[in-house]
């Protein structure tokens, strides 16, 4: 990950640290997200977790991880509460398999409000968008199981 990308999102170097960038969200009581460039991971703080677990750290392994990261940043900027954001929500998809929704935003009653499936620009997006138009794709599979969204 490049520092220019982080700076464009208004992340700044963390004081007394090397290769760690931080962003505080004043609209959420200074909630913060940290990015560690040495360890190549994102710490989404103490309120945004993966699939209802207590894990809030994501290792950056693929380009889509950066899309999810930027989307979470924008959700927080827009006023969505960190407590209402769940990453990689698992939904059963039949025959003993499951899928992972990139981002689920819940309402204040903890019901599904917004489902977001992130894709990188180009071939991955085009393929997913074509599938969405054809049969609903991944997103509508999740929606069928949680129609509050």
What are these regions (language model features)?
Residues 1-149:
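A short, conserved, highly charged catalytic patch centered on acidic carboxylates
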């Amino acid at each position: 990950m490049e520092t220019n990308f982080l700076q464009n999102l208004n992340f700044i170097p963390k004081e007394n640290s090397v290769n760690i960038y931080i962003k505080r969200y004043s609209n959420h009581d200074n909630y913060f997200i940290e990015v560690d460039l040495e360890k190549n991971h994102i710490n989404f703080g103490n309120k945004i977790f993966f699939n209802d677990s207590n894990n809030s750290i994501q290792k950056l392994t693929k380009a889509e991880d950066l899309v999810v990261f930027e989307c979470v940043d924008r959700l927080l900027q827009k006023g969505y509460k960190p407590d209402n954001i769940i990453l990689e929500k698992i939904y059963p998809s039949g025959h003993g398999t499951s899928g992972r929704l990139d981002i689920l935003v819940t309402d204040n009653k903890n019901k599904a409000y917004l489902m977001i499936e992130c894709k990188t620009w180009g071939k991955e997006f085009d393929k997913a968008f074509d599938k969405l138009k054809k049969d609903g794709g991944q997103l509508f599979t999740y929606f069928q199981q949680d129609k509050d969204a």
